[in-house]
Amino acid sequence: MTEVGGSIGSGSADKRYRLCRLASQEQVPLVMMLEDAGHRVNETANGRRPGDFMSLAELSRRVPLVNLACGASAGHGALTAPLSNFIAMTESASIVATGPLLVRSATGEDVTNVELGGPSVAVDSGGVVHNVVADDRAAIALARRYLAHFPLNAWESLPRRDGPDAGRRRVDLLPLIPPDSRRPHAIRPVFEALVDGGALLDVQQTSGSPIVTALAHPGGRSIAIVAIDPSVLAGTIDGDAVDKAAHFLDVADAFDLPCLFVAGNPGVLAGTSAGGQGILRHAARLFAVQHRMRVPKLHMTLRKVFGFGSSVMAMNPFDGQTVTLALPSITLGALPAAPAASGIDDPDERARVSAEQSEASVRAAARSTYDDVSTLGTSETPYWLAWTWPKVVPHGRGNGGLSVSCPDAVGGMRLRWVRPASSTCLPTWLHRRR
């Protein structure tokens, strides 16, 4: 900001373009720190020149892109942020399309940069920026922590985290999940019990909060987590949550991060407000993104899942899941039991519908919807998903394949998925040794 107000002239544009080309050429991550006044007005007529917009759009699925807003950023500089994979800003920063002077001349509105695009707008309301930090040092530290989950580029293998807490573990999740499906519970403690050191990197925690998107290292390997948070809107999915999850999954798929989906929701948000916001369009986008993913997909149903809410959380049969798990106490169906049964006059029939949903996990397992349903109340209850992770290797361009063994699978058989380096998936059924 000390040089021509931080505006982007032809020389600055050339530098930005050059850095983008270097990141592509050397196949390394690109980190941008924003504090600028946008494009320099008196150089608008300088003719056609290479730009960083196109380069950033191409890079976003090739190398990790991180954008840090460390001050006021407007116009051209601010518009580069949404092209990145991850965006963070400091508490005093702002990110706006146009600054206060232009807003005043165009609309008569007298506002400040912070009111236009401070953290409360850019993060909480708009969802443009993912995370907020205290200052520049914290922003750089967060960028390092984020990049630690990613390879240098989309062709490299994922980094492995070694440490005393990176081994296999037995975890009983049942005390963390209330048996009453109407009682909300926090979802993050569930993941903290599964991952190394209990360390989660929440991405965009304050926007679209019905869905949690986070990065972690279970068994020393990087994963992406997309989970329903029952403590927010009872786990009902709204448009902001869907958009957040879709972007997060797109980034995970680009860099071969296996993805864990955790469902526990009554479906997508209903009502006139949700319909006016295009909830079905948002939900369809998330379904399409998760369906197109080439990375290993692992699904867990904790308590309940209904309707389209199950489809957007990767619980679709024959949709490329590596492992699909559930607690035996779950309920599932096209609709929750009460609404589904409300249209039935016969009380015996209503009771039958409710009973069917309460036994849903056992019936679903028998039909191979789930690969395993853990047994409640015994020493065998620990969810073996965490033990599976050390064997999960993404089958992307730079990796040799994937092999996951599913102990105690349905029907007294052992299911072993062998996924070669190609996209072909070869399921092999093996009799369990007795």
Predicted regions mapped to residue ranges:
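Ligand-binding clefts of soluble mixed alpha/beta catalytic domains
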Residues: M1-L426
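Short, intrinsically disordered C-terminal tails of secreted or membrane-associated proteins
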Residues: W429-R433
